[in-house]
Amino acid sequence: MSKAVGDLGLVGLAVMGQNLILNAADHGFTVVAYNRTQSKVDRFLANEAKGKSIIGATSIEDLVAKLKKPRKIMLLIKAGAPVDTLIKELVPHLDKGDIIIDGGNSHFPDTNRRYEELTKQGILFVGSGVSGGEDGARFGPSLMPGGSAEAWPHIKNIFQSIAAKSNGEPCCEWVGPAGSGHYVKMVHNGIEYGDMQLICEAYDIMKRIGRFTDKEISEVFDKWNTGVLDSFLIEITRDILKFDDVDGKPLVEKIMDTAGQKGTGKWTAINALDLGMPVTLIGEAVFARCLSAIKDERKRASKLLAGPTVPKDAIHDREQFVYDLEQALYASKIISYAQGFMLIREAARSYGWKLNNPAIALMWRGGCIIRSVFLAEITKAYRDDPDLENLLFNEFFASAVTKAQSGWRRTIALAATYGIPTPAFSTALAFYDGYRSERLPANLLQAQRDYFGAHTFRILPECASAHLPVDKDIHINWTGHGGNISSSTYQA
């Protein structure tokens, strides 16, 4: 019988799995590696894992037998049906109190279901977001675990040891119950979509209106990366824009302008609609990728549909132009994160989760794709007030957006004048203006709904009267002259 020496079992030896195993071994943990294809295990042990505290398993039974109790088994395999299949194979060999960790990109409703099913069987289940890509897995990812709280004391040391560190603090903390870990990872990915789209719009404005070369744009991003916009995505954009092909021309300009997506941004946008949250920037970022995908249609439209042209002298003050653009990017980024945390807040309320908001912001400060110095202020905001309703109610962020507002508006106006699409910048500003409006035209919208569908409406308290009572659903015959008013409970 195999000796139980493993601290962690890991199933799935694609690059992410291998790198996470090597990371754990570097931190003094003994890892048992398993893959359905035995040759992958053998190759890994003979090469990258050679000489490290990594042992192989030849079967599910062998994997389980080599792990210390309570057994901790992490899955880094394709999301969906393969996870369910593997869990079914694992469970008969486990004891109550053993721990299964799904580290893949699972959709949170699936994690909720697995959590419920395994809890009934006495198995502790953790759904953990893992961000940072291949390098993150190897040298320190952002980890977002949630699920069975009883599992946390058993996996905390491993997770916080292998996680990225920000100012000495691990970018890993317990998120909350059920599928909350994967939910937070989903929102992280949605914010990532938004950040990337904002950066692309800034690039497009500099290129098409400012007529900057790629090298000049790279220099702008390099400068921005020393200030409030310092982040991983700004850093890699700088590097991409100065990368030349073998002919000396920028490689980025040779890439087809059709962006792919794996679906996590779409999940975030759909969930925002389900919960009634105006997470507009992530939604526009998803739609921007969809628009990019219809390349042939866009080519035909470019020959048929007229629009303004950009004159050579569109920009008279390049320094002011770049400053305004920086302010637009910064303010829009604040809106994106404010919307993301609004969604997390509403999810906690709707799903009955108690979430650790300060820890969520901290987890994103290092190791992950959206890591940035900006997140330090979000962490501080939620540490100062864990129940903060919206980031825009925090003094730092309210002041930052107010200061950036003029440049933000000028940038969007300039882009609109010359026909440059800015869906993310524009929706961020539209949200800001809507959010700060005490009164919106939804009064007319609700009257329209009542006119054609008897959907009823409510009266403003200061406008209440005997025939228009407050706190009542009211329907009116709009084809008359103010008569035929009746209360109704009809809703649609």
Curated annotation (Swiss-Prot):
Catalytic activity annotation: 6-phospho-D-gluconate + NADP(+) = D-ribulose 5-phosphate + CO2 + NADPH
Binding site for substrate: N105, S131, G132, G133, H188, N189, Y193, K262, R289, R449, H455
Entry's EC annotation: 1.1.1.44
Keywords from the named record: Gluconate utilization, NADP, Oxidoreductase, Pentose shunt
Binding site for NADP(+): G12, L13, A14, V15, M16, G17, N35, R36, T37, I77, K78, A79, N105
Gene Ontology CC annotations of this record: cytosol; plasma membrane
GO molecular function list: NADP binding; phosphogluconate dehydrogenase (decarboxylating) activity
Pathway(s): Carbohydrate degradation; pentose phosphate pathway; D-ribulose 5-phosphate from D-glucose 6-phosphate (oxidative stage): step 3/3
GO BP: D-gluconate metabolic process; pentose-phosphate shunt, oxidative branch
SUPFAM superfamilies on file: 6-phosphogluconate dehydrogenase C-terminal domain-like, NAD(P)-binding Rossmann-fold domains
Keyword Glycosyltransferase included in the entry's annotation: no
Active site location: K185, E192
EC class: oxidoreductase
Entry-linked InterPro entries: 6-PGluconate_DH-like_C_sf, 6PGD_dom2, 6PGDH_C, 6PGDH_Gnd/GntZ, 6PGDH_NADP-bd, 6PGdom_BS, NAD(P)-bd_dom_sf, Pgluconate_DH
Similarity comment text for this entry: Belongs to the 6-phosphogluconate dehydrogenase family.
Function: Catalyzes the oxidative decarboxylation of 6-phosphogluconate to ribulose 5-phosphate and CO(2), with concomitant reduction of NADP to NADPH.
Subunit structure: Homodimer.
Leftover remarks: Present with 556 molecules/cell in log phase SD medium.
Protein name: 6-phosphogluconate dehydrogenase, decarboxylating 2
Organism (species): Saccharomyces cerevisiae (strain ATCC 204508 / S288c) (Baker's yeast)
Name of encoding gene: GND2
